[in-house]
Amino acid sequence: MLHFSGSLTRLVGELKKLPGVGEKSAQRLAFHLLKHPSNIEALAQSLLQVGERVHLCSVCFAITEDDPCWICSGERDSGTICVVEEPQDLLALERSRAFSGRYHVLQGALSPLNGVTPKDLRIAELMQRLQGGEVREVLIATNFTVEGEATALYLTRLIKPLSIKVTRLAHGIPVGSDLEYVDAATVQRAVEGRSEL
């Protein structure tokens, strides 16, 4: 940022570190904050509070201010654990209201090319949770990417010997979409995963 103050240049530099925020977007955000100075203090306070108060649940590794989180300390079905990659995935499932069990957040997915191994994820903690005998089913809800599929396969191989039912989220054609616009792999999975009516 040529000819701007050092403070503004630093702000733009910090904003650019956020995912999906490039130079232009960072400048736009910085100038918006300058136009509305009352927002600066509120934003700064929110950022500080998140840094001080928000942490990972010691049971499921979701983001929380309380430990254990409200899901782990609530009246949810403790016999079913849904494994997700990131806390955002847990929120998506909760919005659907389709799952009433508990969660386990891996904090990522296996990615040998990026140096992410099982030791980098919360897999050991998941396996420890499964030792108690209370869990009947593990629903693997990793993303349908190469990394997510590899993680699902790896987890299945670890969990199956424990005589715990392992299921995977169904995937197929999104509601409201036309078949002609759906990729071949999605159509294939939808056909293979068809159910009887």
From Swiss-Prot:
Would the keyword Translocase be found if you checked this record's keyword annotation?
no
Q: Give a yes or no for keyword Hydrolase in this entry.
A: no
| Gene3D superfamilies reported in the protein's UniProt record | 3.30.60.80, 3.40.1360.10, 6.10.250.240, RecR Domain 1 (1.10.8.420)
Q: Which domain of life is it from?
A: Bacteria
Q: Which Pfam families match?
A: RecR_C (PF21175), RecR_HhH (PF21176), RecR_ZnF (PF02132), Toprim_4 (PF13662)
GO biological process terms held by the UniProt record: DNA recombination; DNA repair
Q: Name one GO molecular function term.
A: DNA binding
- In residue numbers, where are the C4-type zinc fingers? 57-72
Q: Which residues form the Toprim domain?
A: 79-174
The similarity comment for this entry is: Belongs to the RecR family.
Q: Which NCBIfam families match?
A: recR
Protein name per the record: Recombination protein RecR
